[in-house]
Amino acid sequence: MKLEKLIIENFRGYQGRTEIVLDDLTALIGRNDVGKTTVLDALGVFFGHKLCKYDVSDKCVYSEDNDDVKIGCVFSGVPENLVIDATSETTLNDEYLLNEDGLLELHKIFKKGKGAGAIHAYCNHPSARDAKGILLKKNDELKAIAERLSIEVEDRRSNVILRQAIYREKGELRLTPQYISLAKEDGKTIWEQIQTYLPHFALFRADRPSTDEESEVQDPMKAAVVNALNEIETDLNEIKVKVKEKALAVATNTITHLNDI
């Protein structure tokens, strides 16, 4: 996925909502203490960088006590399919988790500026009765809704199939922009899948020396190696089988000759 926009709200010096559009190359230019480092730290907090830890003191001092701190990222190039369980696949579009522009907009929200932050999708999501919030419902709850609406499905064990059947039956879903938590049930599973597609965030600090032993350098290389190995996993398994067959053939032949002797 590609990062298209950063959204900061009530984080340090950024009171209210601030949007920063990101191109292939983006430079932040400004005088000292204008908030350039805050932008990079906000990205670090969202992506969970070890050098960027959120603290309650990071909440904007001009915000209200009940105001939330939000750090959002908007992505294009979302995955075509997501695997929910061994038998079910879905898409972000089918789950109504994309915003009005058809992009994936994720926010790490710190309620009242406290806590570890929870991931929410800001999306055009159903608000109609029986269709609202069903991404976060358990299988038994989905089956109860399906029974109430007299819906028959081929596999009642699949939350994906149940949700899509409910959406189709309701018809008018009353889509409205809203925050949907990705902290539990299939929402959590979808977030776990999304994380494998997130861009890698590396932070190089100019005030300290950088070496090829640092995680900013090694982590992308390790990820590239893992991806390459995954792509040729089938070939490697075939090689492993052939090596095993050859070794067993030699061993069997040797034992046969020893028995003859």
Regions found by a protein language model. Name each.
Residues 1-48, 56-66:
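Pre-Walker A-like glycine/lysine-rich segment at the N-terminus of P-loop NTPase domains
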Residues 24, 73-77, 205-208:
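Flexible glycine-/small-residue-rich
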Residues 26, 75-79, 110-114:
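Beta-strand elements of well-folded, non-transmembrane domains
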Residues 40-102:
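Conserved P-loop NTP-binding catalytic core
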Residues 55-59, 91-93, 175-194:
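Short alpha-helical segments and helix-capping/turn motifs at coil-helix boundaries
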Residues 73-87, 153-185:
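Extended, Lys/Arg-enriched charged tracts that mediate electrostatic binding to polyanionic substrates
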Residues 100, 104-112, 124-148:
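Extended, regular secondary-structure scaffolds
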Residues 179-187, 194-261:
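Extended helical coiled-coil dimerization/tether regions that scaffold
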